[in-house]
Amino acid sequence: LENIDSLFMAMTYNIPVQSVIFSGLRGVGKTVLINSLQKKAEEKNIFCKHIEVEERNDFISQIASCSQAFLRKISAKEKFKHLIQKPLEAIKSLVISFDPNDSTFSLSVQERELYKSSNLTQSLTDVFTTLGEAAYQSEIPICFFIDEIQYMKSAELGALIAALHRTNQLGYPIMIVGAGLPKIYAMLSEKKSYSERLFL
């Protein structure tokens, strides 16, 4: 826990850090742990959002909603409003392409075609890197707390790892604190060879 506290502290200095995944059987206190870590992060003025992945497969909807919440936070300050457009465009593309039932963005058929993407990894990477740039410039780091990661679709997990990897390469302060059943480690190692470097 001290290690994680030092990661949070590094983020407040705009230093990119590794993400953290906790695994264990049901009932061992993973959710309680990540909730307490979220409080610690919030005390350091890190922007935090909790996502509980469920079998109904709504990860894309939740990550988009959490990302928009970050943009609302920074838009409250006039000097940061110019940072919003790029991540908003990326979120729009992600939602229109991979969460078609979402009605957040009302666009014409022609506009929808402009935002349409068939590559989830690229779309989520665009969201994370543009969010990361806004986080860096506004000096408001971001931490997403994701519970029940094992319910993520394989393509979503692979896209999340790739997005985190690219964000980390660019030096942006975004991290994940996740929790899941023990099989999550096998799922991570199957997805990307560099996932072991991304997570503590």
Task: Tell me the role of every PLM-derived stretch.
Residues L1, L120-L124, K153-E156:
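Phosphate/oxyanion-binding active-site loops and adjacent basic polyanion-contact surfaces
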Residues E2-I4, D126-T130, G180-K183:
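Short acidic/polar alpha-helix capping motifs at helix-coil junctions
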Residues Y13-V28, V32-I142, Y172-I174:
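P-loop NTPase nucleotide-binding core
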Residues I140-L200:
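The catalytic "switch" region of P-loop NTPases
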Residues E2-Y13:
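Pre-Walker A adenine-sensing motif
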